[in-house]
Amino acid sequence: MPQLSRYSDEHVEQLLSELLSVLEKHKAPTDLSLMVLGNMVTNLINTSVAPAQRQAIANSFARALQSSISEDNAH
C-alpha cells in the first residue's frame, strides 16, 4: 500500500517480514492468510479506534487496499 506515514519504511518492512514469516511457518494458504489478516484488521479497529470513527477508518483502509492491488496477471 502506498504510505504517507510517520513510520519509517524500515520499520514497516520489518513488521511485514515478521508477519509473513509467521504465515509461512504455518504453511497458511492464501485464503487462510487473508482470513487471519482480515480478522486482525477487524480486531485492531474494534479495540483501538473510537466507535464513532470505526466506519471511516474501515472505509479508508478498504480504499487504500483496493488502490494498491495490481491488475497484472502475475501471481
Curated annotation (Swiss-Prot):
InterPro entries (UniProt xref): UPF0352, YejL_sf
Record protein name field: UPF0352 protein YejL
Superkingdom classification of source: Bacteria
Native species: Salmonella typhimurium (strain LT2 / SGSC1412 / ATCC 700720)
Entries under NCBIfam families matching the protein: PRK13689.1
A Pfam family it matches: DUF1414
Similarity annotation: Belongs to the UPF0352 family.
